[in-house]
Design a protein with these regions (language model features):
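A structural boundary/capping signal
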Residues: 16, 22-223
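Short Cys/His-rich zinc-binding micro-motifs
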Residues: 1-17
């Protein structure tokens, strides 16, 4: 627990007594969200960006999703676009200090800054239905929210496996609609998950309208 004169754990640079002492910050997730708001001071639409980011994060934790970067990125992309935020849906190879080889992954970018929730519960090196590997805390505006500094993850790195990576090639040859429709755990695919999260955000979205609007979108390859 921070003392009154300690630096505030939200990362604002202010003393705790001058910042979040009267706010309920009891978990790492709360601290991450406070840091995201601090990072967003010069960002357009900061509140819907932060709220949507963490609504998707909380939903993925509640549903116990692992290795779900494409699903998480697709949902976040649609929610941000529906709130007037010019997000881009990216896929490519990334490199983590915790993994000795580059691997295919997807994420969202806004104004060329990375917003990535998928590495928090990544698939482990040896597949297991009950385990995951934490490669990074959520990355918001290029910032690792746990370290509160620029992420060490490298995005869009080259790879000799570009043509042979089955996961990458599959996603590149699908529309967003194909992927969202094929999600097996909701009767309306991932579109239903979008509507669930939108309701929590106070957004009124129509299932059929968003399907029609985004069904032909695709993941953009970043290299």
């Amino acid at each position: 627990m921070a003392e009154r004169n300690d630096p505030c754990p939200c990362g604002s640079g202010k003393k705790y007594k001058k910042c979040c002492i009267n706010k309920e910050i009891s978990t790492p997730f709360d601290i991450w969200k406070q840091r995201a708001f601090q990072i967003s001071t010069d960002v357009k639409h900061p509140e819907p960006l932060v709220d949507s980011f963490f609504a998707v994060f909380n939903h993925s934790i509640k549903k116990n999703w692992r290795g779900a970067c494409h699903a998480i990125s697709g949902i976040l992309y649609v929610l941000l676009r529906e709130q007037g935020i010019h997000a881009q849906l990216k896929v490519g190879f990334v490199k983590s200090p915790k993994v000795h080889f580059e691997f295919s992954h997807s994420w969202v970018e806004v104004d060329e800054k990375v917003y990535d929730l998928g590495l928090y519960r990544s698939n482990p090196p040896v597949a297991s239905p009950n385990e995951y590997q934490e490669l990074s805390a959520p990355i918001f505006h290029n910032i690792d929210l746990e370290a509160n500094m620029e992420t060490s993850i490298r995005y869009g790195v080259p790879s000799v496996r570009e043509k042979t990576d089955r996961n990458l090639q599959t996603i590149l040859n699908m529309t967003l609609g194909d992927y969202m429709n094929g999600w097996p755990n909701h009767k309306n695919g991932l579109w239903g998950e979008v509507i669930e999260i939108a309701d929590r955000l106070g957004l009124s979205l129509n299932l059929h309208e968003i399907k029609e609007k985004y069904t032909n979108e695709q993941f953009s390859f970043n290299s």
